[in-house]
């Protein structure tokens, strides 16, 4: 009952706030964020923030992921992410990790990355900013992650074993259930056939050129964004970005463009039942497909209203299902 009252109060407050805003109004931008686009198409976002003081975070987002892979390249978006820590043009071998750890940036905790279906992100967190040389090196790393990952043959072969072991470690009942669930939810689309990490046979045997081709095809400046937030001089960082990233070329006019891979609607409910002897509990999940908002609404108030309403309806459905599950 208390939760229901809280929900009503929150919805009432949200309605009052939304009444002051029109759905077609732009979402107010943070005036402290410096936004720019380089001639090669790369975007950057910079913001000064002194909490915590003396530190900053450096990110590069690539708007490409596993769904850009060809069938023969499955797992290579994730494999490429691993290779970014095995040598770049300006920091060969393990020099990147060694330099950062000497300066308090720990591999795994502060230096990391992830790959998903649609994006790949590399990050440096908790970088000390007292020494300008450390900041410059962090920017150089972002530069190298854009276009200058080494992809040395021996390093590629060494990493095969690492990733195959990662796949073996994941391969429990929960992982197998997730793969089956994602395939069912995304049935009829390219997403149905992607699991991000790939499959053992492909990881063992892919040709080095396939990895290089994926890298050069999709790691392009128009699909990349740099985000830097922390105790930094915004003007200095912006000038360094403009200078440092200038050698990243504009993509050729005939470069392949990303496709929009849609998940088709289904006229009848899709039912997927998965059983595994290693499962320790029974789980039921209900997914409801909703049309995505058109891209032109992404930066408008209506997109926030849509997200809030989705969150509340999901929470209400969750509560009701939990109540049913607790009944004798």
Language-model region placement:
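Active-site-adjacent, His/Asp/Glu-enriched structural segments that form or flank metal-binding
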Residues: 52-54, 62-176, 205, 210-223, ...
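An aromatic/glycine/proline-enriched structural segment found at the starts
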Residues: 21, 188, 225-282
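Short acidic/His-enriched helical or mixed secondary-structure segments at domain edges of catalytic enzymes
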Residues: 162-184, 262-281, 319, 323-328
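Mature N-terminal segment immediately following signal peptide/propeptide cleavage
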Residues: 26-61
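Bacterial Sec-dependent N-terminal signal peptides
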Residues: 1-21
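Short, solvent-exposed loop/turn segments at the edges of secondary structure
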Residues: 39, 53-55, 104, 115-119, ...
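Histidine-acidic residue clusters that define the catalytic metal-binding segment
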Residues: 21-34, 122-125, 132, 140, ...
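His/Glu-based metal-binding/catalytic segments typifying zinc-dependent metallopeptidases
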Residues: 255-319
């Amino acid at each position: 009952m208390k939760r229901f009252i809280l929900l009503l109060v929150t919805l009432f407050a949200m309605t009052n706030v939304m009444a002051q805003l029109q759905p077609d109004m732009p979402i107010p931008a943070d005036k402290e964020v410096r936004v720019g686009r380089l001639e090669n198409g790369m975007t950057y976002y910079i913001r000064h923030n002194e909490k915590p003081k003396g530190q900053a975070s450096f990110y590069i987002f690539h708007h490409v992921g596993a769904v850009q892979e060809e069938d023969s390249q499955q797992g290579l978006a994730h494999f490429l992410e691993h290779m970014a820590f095995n040598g770049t043009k300006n920091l060969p071998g393990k020099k990147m990790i060694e330099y950062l750890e000497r300066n308090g940036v720990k591999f795994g905790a502060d230096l990391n990355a992830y790959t998903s279906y649609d994006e790949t992100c590399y990050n440096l967190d908790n970088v000390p900013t007292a020494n300008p040389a450390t900041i410059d090196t962090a920017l150089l790393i972002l530069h190298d992650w854009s276009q200058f990952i080494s992809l040395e043959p021996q390093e590629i072969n060494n990493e095969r074993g690492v990733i195959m072991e990662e796949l073996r470690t994941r391969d429990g009942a929960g992982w197998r259930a997730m793969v089956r669930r994602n395939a069912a939810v995304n049935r009829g689309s390219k997403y149905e056939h992607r699991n991000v990490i790939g499959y053992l046979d492909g990881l063992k045997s892919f040709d080095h050129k396939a990895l290089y081709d994926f890298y050069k095809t999709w790691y392009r400046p128009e699909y990349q964004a740099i985000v830097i937030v922390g105790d930094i001089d915004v003007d200095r960082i912006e000038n360094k970005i403009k200078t440092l990233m200038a050698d990243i070329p504009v993509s050729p006019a005939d470069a392949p463009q990303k496709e929009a891979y849609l998940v088709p609607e289904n006229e009848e409910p899709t039912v997927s039942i998965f059983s595994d002897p290693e499962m320790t509990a029974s789980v039921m999940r209900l997914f409801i497909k909703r049309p995505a908002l058109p891209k032109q609404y992404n930066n408008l108030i209506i997109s926030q209203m849509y997200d809030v309403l989705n969150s509340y309806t999901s929470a209400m459905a969750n509560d009701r299902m939990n109540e049913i599950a607790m009944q004798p």
